Regions:
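Hydrophobic beta-strand residues in large extracellular and virion-surface proteins
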Residues: 36, 43-45, 223, 227, ...
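...with weaker cross-activation on analogous glycine-rich loops/strands in unrelated enzymes
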Residues: 264-345, 349
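N-terminal capping segments
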Residues: 217-265, 307, 312-316
Length: 372
């Protein structure tokens, strides 16, 4: 009877008071002893006489068996009539048996209760741990070739016989299509799951270029890269070319030129932070918020200073180079007090905004997230 509820026990039971003896109670709640037939198979449970003559090695009703057996719909591993539990290596294959009942476990299993921080997959057909690439219920997964641990994130399939880089989601499924991160956008082939690395690729009828790290060089990235490529090359000045053509630039002149070079329409002149708003709207940007709450996203163009009051040195503009809670921004700025070659700086956005006195701001974002 159950120690808590007092309910009569039926079915299999692992007696931990006597090692790990597997016992069976029939529908009437009676302990089975002697021979017992189940699903065409005959099993033997120790009788009182056998237990008495075993010198303490058997208890009444203990299943007498060795090796793998199937009983009452479960598979057990028996050694010297004792149920084995946890991870067991049998004939060079790993199996998992429930830590309490001893029943073989199949499918996805978290091994944390068994002392290992990994998720593995045990083939339902034979209970064996699987390795490498596995198609399960129509989804591709990757399991470490040595440990069997389910892998996530970026993975090179070269050790598994394929020349491609793939990405596996948090649930272990292979990722297809766009993968948008806080810093870069990536694309994975819709059929093979291979990451697009380098070259030009047609995606949904539009051509995109990718660098040799798999970063998509879309419109937003080209704006950011305009600034990245000019680090250590520009000196801040509001009175020279303003767009870097003479080695000097200011924030709004740089932003105008960066957006134009990324593929926007021609500008009438190099705008300041007051007049830049119209150029942004005319080139696919929409206003996310004026001084309201927002989560920075890669490619956001932010203008500091109230429109109509931010001309000259009163305003600033920058682009978000990394979104999310740890947002980073890049711009041509006066942060280094006009030191030569240091005008382009990448700084933590929230820190920089507070440094500037939490000024009024406008956030603009491309309406076409994957503008090519």
């Amino acid at each position: 009877f159950d120690n808590v509820t007092g309910a009569m026990y039926r079915g299999t039971y692992v007696d931990y008071n006597h090692g790990r003896a597997l016992e069976f109670y029939n529908n009437g709640g009676q302990l089975v002893t002697g021979s017992y037939n189940s699903n065409g198979q005959t099993y033997h449970f120790a009788t009182e006489q056998e237990a008495a003559s075993s010198n303490g090695k058997l208890v009444v009703g203990q299943l007498i068996a060795n090796g793998m057996i199937k009983f009452q719909g479960n598979t057990y591993d028996m050694i010297d009539n004792q149920v084995q539990t946890g991870q067991q290596k049998i004939d060079n294959n790993w199996y998992l048996f429930d830590k309490n009942s001893g029943a073989m476990q199949t499918g996805f299993q978290n091994l944390a209760p068994y002392g290992q921080n990994k998720i593995c997959y045990y083939n339902p057909a034979n209970g064996q741990m699987e390795y490498g690439q596995q198609n399960i219920n129509g989804h591709w997964y990757l399991f470490d070739k040595v440990t069997g641990a389910r892998l996530t994130g970026w993975q090179s399939l070269a050790p598994y016989g394929q020349n491609k880089e793939c990405f596996y989601n948090q649930d272990g499924t292979m990722h297809y299509g766009w993968l948008d991160t806080d810093r870069y956008d990536y694309y994975f082939d819709n059929v093979t799951g291979a990451e697009y690395i380098g070259g030009s690729h047609n995606i949904d009828g539009r051509w995109y270029n990718f660098d040799n790290q798999g970063h998509c060089l879309d419109f937003n990235q080209r704006v950011i890269n305009w600034f990245e490529s000019r680090k250590d090359h520009l000196t801040y000045s509001m009175y020279g070319s303003r767009n870097g053509s003479d080695g000097t630039a200011d924030c709004s002149g740089s932003m105008t030129q960066a957006i134009r070079d990324a593929g926007a329409g021609p500008y009438a002149y190099l705008y300041n932070t007051d007049s830049l708003h119209g150029y942004l709207r005319a080139n696919g940007y929409y206003l996310v918020t004026a001084n309201g709450n927002f989560t920075p996203e890669r490619g956001d163009v932010i203008v500091w200073g109230r429109q109509g009051e931010s001309g000259g040195a009163a305003g600033h503009t920058l682009v978000i180079s990394q979104g999310g809670n740890d947002a980073q921004c890049i711009s041509t700025c006066y942060y280094t007090n006009d030191q030569p070659g240091t005008a382009v700086q990448e700084l933590p956005y929230n820190w920089y905004w507070h440094l500037d006195g939490c000024t009024y701001y406008y956030v603009y974002r491309q309406g076409d997230q994957h503008r090519n």
